[in-house]
């Protein structure tokens, strides 16, 4: 009993798997399931109740016995609930024991109850059956076939309970599910064939699945007919399927085999359809996407259906049915609208015609046009219909005269079963390969057939290294059957029977392997799955130079080949090399070298991770002495240059190098030596017969050889897209699937003639296809490894960093992001094991690239569309994207910045690289989109800054990268950063102060605007995901809130800020006016305005407040000989304040040891590297270790006094006014003035005022200028008119054949001019918008020309708020100012035209001369006057608005509600909605007065005016 108890504690081992399956059954509708404790409780309770059964094993018989006994028990009222739980748990255990998988406890009880109903009341049932069938044998009781006592059989209908149970399982789990298959196999063992097929037909399920099941049954029937010729004792298909038989006839014993075969066929069909439904290419899973056209959907659907191994009627049914049911909702509605009730029976061509426009932008307009189009005449139906079989219009596929297509040879006119080529293959001679299993291209020179015992029979099998599986035509049924298996090869898809654990014997070696029984195979094949186990190998090396053209190679002139002795190798490596070389010799790849071949190249070997040895050859010396060949292939093909194809195939050439013979006269130079251990025998010398690995010409010889072999074949197939790189072949086409595979077949057969093998395990049919590191998909491409490894902060070796960067650079054509900080990290020590330190900035830069790689996908090239290349400003690099449609890039890339080149030059360099890439990959010249404006690029070209522009180019606005709008002008949760930047104390400074207490400041050169942006950039770098930024720069504030998508980004600081902000969650930007008493804003302004002590480097330590100086650190171990001085440069740059100087002193610990610092004074404002001069006063050498504190830096205040001369009253040096008192300082400016005049030809007054030279000297310069004397203006110009600020005149003028529109501001004389195409109103209105945008005028005067008086022009002037007047007709004085400007402009233009290449540039130079270089009598130019007037207007407007805000009033105060006397007048300090604030003069206090006690009065000035 003790032992039994211990066994019970351990549970029930024989029911371990049963209990495990039972624990998956749910208790109710929720997710709660039975537990192991529930099962053990039920089993132990049963053992306790029925002690007589306790020792019996838990079989299904024992469980049924317990179930019957439990039914006979009546529990007490208090135990009914536990008793019901016991019964339910037992029912679940019984179902698991029988292999059933009910989902819930209730379902398990129903199953047991149903099975119990089939067996309960046996006596009552027996009596009932005995009445119906008196001759029934009572001991054999099965339904619906019943055995009669007379020896015959009868039939009874399938019970409704069983039928309902099967219906329930089919609805819950599916018609082809394992549950339904298991239930049907259980019940149908005694059914007739007719019962099985009728019940299967009445089951609920997908109609397409039922058609596929019927097709599989038809295939089984055809296979039965082929394998079992008609005979006296052979069952026919009609007998197996129960056709033409009554129920009584089908129930007889002679039909038992037919019923079993029928059930087996049904089970096989269910399994085949189930496996088919889970495959990725299942047609029923091909559904139309929302963004996909109906034609593309049909192409994918037909491709999937054509690939299915089913009969043509089923394919036709699937095409008609799935083309409607799997279409999108829009297409279904369109088909319903167009085809009406016959939509389910319509052909695919009719549905494509109906849905041709669904999804396009003009869909609604086309529907409207169709509705308004008159009805066509009858009799024209089908004229535009297109046959999907031959591709010709005028008929449908089912009416095609070309007939059906053979799935074996790809030809039209016959079916596969009637194919002559297939029959001829069955009569091939020994050595031929199986065309159905392997492609017909593997035609080697008589591959051997060997005798293999398969099961109990000896067979001659063809040794085929290209076949994956072992194929036999018949089998003795030994082993374990594993059902049907689908074999896919280049020749098509076929189906066979798989058997495992089959006894195989070759000579004395016996194994248990796997075979495939394929009755239609013309030859039996031993595949790779069993060759290795049996120790069989086959090398088919083709070394016949008659077939493969040989490429001539030779040594350089005067070279005699390598003569390098073989170095010693260990015993282990010699054994590994011997094994490899022996194998190569057997395969015919190396041969024994004759004695007079004296050259030698060393060999060695390494052990791979798998434990096998790999042979390596040191060809460095031979490579040096060998003449080079031209490069056959200049680069790697790129998927962005591929065209989108319907079908693709990727092939790999096996043993590519070892198939091509080496040029025979050259072979003597490739000799190598196999050493003999301990010199126990002579060495063995070999030479290479084929292209060896590691030889520098192997790739070139291989590529030239393949070029010669494939040239003719490629020319014969212009309809395909063919690519080859080394041993990888790409084939793409838009042909039908059979035709495409036929071309692949043809290529394989063609190169097989030269001995090249195409292993099937490396062949890829269809998408996705892996090729050259890329992964090709139907509509896109990406990299095979579409992720980059993560990096973390901390040390990293240069070797590992280089590998990471290499992975990134390889994927740049999908990333397109620069990594300047990571690249900078690679600078310095070039030792591979040297360490670098990864910081947070590097991690962020790397993560940005990883995220971009996840998001990006490349597209294919369309030869009918133009190609565009768009360049953009990146982080210290130029980034560009190549595309044909927006948002669908072909590829992207990065060109890193080049020193000493401007931004424009760098962009042009990147554009050159982009153009070159596009031409190489597509053969087209791209249209280049440059950032900025066209005028800027034309000016850069004219000025000579750039010397090349693309053939086709234009400009664009906006940066396509920044789309995220997460900057708002509201407060967000998070810290606040107060930023400021600008020129402080003559130096650029920037920084921020955060609400968290964090501070940052730094010196940096730049303009005020740049420094303000840099301060924001630094705050964004350090700030969290949510933060606030406060700035007093209106420029920076408006930039942060600007719509960046429409901004021309030319500022690299702005681009970097955009990238930082793009990665934030949300940023609140706020503006405050500067110097207005806001505490935090004043604090940051003071903080960066201080001249602060700044350091760079790690050579100094922070000091305590009580320390005298800062400790300096020795950068490395320094050795100072006795009595000598050494200068030590430390890792420190320092920036002293202007009122400081510093001294480097000796530390007392060093002075005690006789080591002193010499000198060491640092002047105020010094910004360089610190050097320490050390003197060793000892008589022995002193060593200062690295990191030791060896000196100190002491800061001192700077005191400056002027030196007064003693007795000397005159100075000899130059003063502020020149040499002594001569005043001749202006003489040095005369050459500068002459040079300036030669550029701009300004007048004498301008030269006099700008360069400070005498008026007479300036006039001499003008008079000596030949250009100015030839183009002299008239001395008097008459005429005048109204003048005023912001009042302009406009008119057209002509210069040679060019028309110029001239504007002049009448107050300042500022001129604005543009070359126009004509004197039209449209042209004038366009120029008016440009003029208004730059100058904001108020009024304009013109003549009565048609362009000026047009109605549209008047409406535009009214819209812009410009007061427009016209002059007096035929009175030139009304336009005198602009007429005089015409003459001045043309006179100056004539002087400058020879200096410029383009007329527009000369016109711009003229405006510079007249507006900026021309000075008036007061020394001001027209531009100065115009700007001064604008500023005065602003100041007046501001003062006026301030004046309007100042108010005065009388007021009275109240005491206990009673008003006092009126006081005042006084100024209102603040005014609100219901009260004001004033200052009481008597008490000097601020009072709040309600509006009812206030009387406002006019300002004092207005009182005086009155």
UniProtKB/Swiss-Prot annotation:
The RT polymerase active site binds 2 magnesium ions. Mg(2+) 2 binds at residues 980, 1012, 1032, 1085. The keyword Membrane does not apply. A zinc finger (CCHC-type) spans 385-402, 404-421. Residues 1447-1499 bind DNA. The active site is at residue 464. Mg(2+) 1 binds at residues 652, 727-728. InterPro entries: Aspartic_peptidase_AS (IPR001969), DNA/RNA_pol_sf (IPR043502), dUTPase-like (IPR029054), dUTPase-like_sf (IPR036157), dUTPase_trimeric (IPR033704), Gag_p24_C (IPR045345), Integrase-like_N (IPR017856), Integrase_C_dom_sf_retrovir (IPR036862). It holds the Pfam family rve. One of its GO terms (molecular function) is DNA binding. Its cofactor is Mg(2+). GO terms for cellular component: viral capsid. Mg(2+) 3 binds at residues 1291, 1343, 1379. SUPFAM superfamilies: Acid proteases, DNA-binding domain of retroviral integrase, DNA/RNA polymerases, dUTPase-like, N-terminal Zn binding domain of HIV integrase, Retrovirus capsid dimerization domain-like, Retrovirus capsid protein, N-terminal core domain, Retrovirus zinc finger-like domains. Residues 1270-1430 form the Integrase catalytic domain. A zinc finger (Integrase-type) spans 1228-1269. GO terms for biological process: DNA integration; DNA recombination; establishment of integrated proviral latency; nucleotide metabolic process; proteolysis; symbiont entry into host cell; viral genome integration into host DNA; viral translational frameshifting. It catalyses: Endonucleolytic cleavage to 5'-phosphomonoester; 3'-end directed exonucleolytic cleavage of viral RNA-DNA hybrid; dUTP + H2O = dUMP + diphosphate + H(+); DNA(n) + a 2'-deoxyribonucleoside 5'-triphosphate = DNA(n+1) + diphosphate. Residues 587-776 form the Reverse transcriptase domain. The record marks 363-364 as: Cleavage. Residues 971-1093 form the RNase H type-1 domain. Its EC number is 3.4.23.-, 2.7.7.49, 2.7.7.7, 3.1.26.4. PANTHER family: ENDOGENOUS RETROVIRUS GROUP K MEMBER POL PROTEIN, RNA-DIRECTED DNA POLYMERASE-RELATED. Belongs to the retroviral Pol polyprotein family. The reverse transcriptase is an error-prone enzyme that lacks a proof-reading function. High mutations rate is a direct consequence of this characteristic. RT also displays frequent template switching leading to high recombination rate. Recombination mostly occurs between homologous regions of the two copackaged RNA genomes. If these two RNA molecules derive from different viral strains, reverse transcription will give rise to highly recombinated proviral DNAs. This is Gag-Pol polyprotein. It comes from Maedi visna virus (strain 1514) (MVV). The gene is pol.
